[in-house]
From Swiss-Prot:
Family: Belongs to the MsrA Met sulfoxide reductase family.
Name this protein carries in UniProt: Peptide methionine sulfoxide reductase MsrA
Physiological role: Has an important function as a repair enzyme for proteins that have been inactivated by oxidation. Catalyzes the reversible oxidation-reduction of methionine sulfoxide in proteins to methionine.
Organismal lineage: Bacteria, Pseudomonadati, Pseudomonadota, Gammaproteobacteria, Lysobacterales
Intrachain disulfide bonds: none
UniProt-annotated catalytic positions: 54
Signal peptide positions (record): none
EC number: 1.8.4.11
Organism: Xylella fastidiosa (strain Temecula1 / ATCC 700964)
Top-level taxon: Bacteria
GO cellular component, one term: cytoplasm
Transmembrane portions of the chain: none
Gene Ontology biological-process entries: cellular response to oxidative stress; protein modification process
Keywords of the record: Oxidoreductase
Reactions catalysed according to its record: L-methionyl-[protein] + [thioredoxin]-disulfide + H2O = L-methionyl-(S)-S-oxide-[protein] + [thioredoxin]-dithiol; [thioredoxin]-disulfide + L-methionine + H2O = L-methionine (S)-S-oxide + [thioredoxin]-dithiol
Length: 216
């Protein structure tokens, strides 16, 4: 079962009176690795949000790909605006840790991004990734276009068949369009593993290749 924010509210996990704020958290609007802006209108570029566990390792995964212009760690899919890391980790906001990926679709295809996403975590684990347990670690794809949504949904069906063959259970990844609001995480979490090369990274895939041919 995919746990939506509505379900979290029903279970009493989101307390809008105690968390969130009306103003964005302070942000150093410069990517620590490539110097590009973290927050911009990004004309001519495409945006997508991926959640695949702890955003420290997930962000590094994507900024290393040719054609990715910028990345940012943040929170999305919850019930309150501008949460903090501490609030998200408490389970009271319903947000997932996600990475905003800004990419040039003439250099890297959405299919390549999807393959990286599926192969780099276990999308069958529900509210956890490995030793990281909590609603914030759930697997999500938040799409900014209907084309992304169609491609992501198709890729999930294809990868589910491949996982079935390998003995895995049902994919729990939630795919949404339109994408919910993205709230930038605190500066200390942006490009964390570039600032702390020996820092924690809990990413781990299933070992099952995602052989999709979507031409997107």
């Amino acid at each position: 079962m995919v746990m939506t924010i509505e379900a979290l509210k029903h279970l009493g996990r989101v307390d809008e009176s105690r968390v969130g704020r009306t103003e964005p958290l302070p942000l150093d609007n410069r990517h620590y690795v490539n110097g590009h802006p973290l927050c911009d209108s990004f004309p001519g570029l495409a945006l997508i949000q991926f959640g695949l566990g702890c955003f420290w390792g997930a962000e590094r995964l994507f900024w290393q790909l040719p054609g990715v212009f910028s990345t940012a760690a943040g929170y999305a899919g919850g019930g309150v605006p501008y949460p903090t890391y501490r609030e998200v980790c408490s389970g009271e906001t319903g947000h997932a840790e996600v990475v905003l990926v800004v990419y040039d679709h003439t250099v890297i295809s959405f299919e390549q991004l999807l393959q990286t996403f599926w192969e780099s975590h276990d999308p069958t684990q529900g509210m956890r990734q490995g030793n990281d347990i909590g609603t914030q670690y759930r697997s999500v794809i938040h799409c900014t276009t209907s084309e992304q949504y169609a491609a992501a949904s198709a890729s999930r069906e294809v990868y589910q068949q491949q996982l079935n063959t390998a003995g895995y259970t049902a994919i729990t990844t939630e795919i949404l369009h339109p994408a919910p609001p993205f709230y930038y995480a605190e500066n200390e979490h942006q490009q964390y593993l570039a600032k702390h090369p020996n820092g924690y990274c809990g990413l781990g895939g299933t070992g099952v290749t995602c052989a999709i041919r979507l031409q997107v």
